[in-house]
Amino acid sequence: MNYIFKTALFVAALALAAGGGKTGQNAETQDTAAVQQETGPHADNDLNREYVATLGGHRFEINIKRTADATLPAVSDELGSTFYDNRVEITATRDGEELFTKQFTKSDFADFVPAADSKGCVLLGMAFDQENSSAATLRFGAQIGQPGIEEGPAFIVEIPAGGGACSIVRDMRQDTMGEEGEQ
């Protein structure tokens, strides 16, 4: 009986020693893989939104495409992570005919935000505002902010449907900067 007990104990110890070595090696590999960090700037996912609206008897088709742009200056957040800034392209057609194609970057909004408030921020994106658009003027909302936080100064962008320069104003109703941004 004592012989069987000792043999069983020896086999169990051998099994633990053999399995324990592999587990330790696998655990080390898994820990190493989990600790490795990505190199280079981070980028937002590309975003493509399509809108269809009937305004003043005309059918408008609007495409808004956001892409991370490595040609724009990269920004760093409070933790030192680096991010590519985004470029947003808006294409609009009226009754099947191209109206305009415009590209926006964070610099288009620089006149409306103090440099200190836009530090570490990217152009988060833009969206079509159908409720406040008309056949004469298409209205969009835009926002800049820190990557991943999605808070920051908001803007109203109006583009004349007949062509011409767009207008940009700070949207204090949608602004998520808090009281500091309202001064």
Task: Kindly give the residue locations of the regions a language model identified.
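Short beta-strand segments
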Residues: 99-102, 151-155, 166-167
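Beta-propeller blade signature
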Residues: 86-92, 155-162
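Acidic, glycine-rich flexible loop segments
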Residues: 114-154, 160
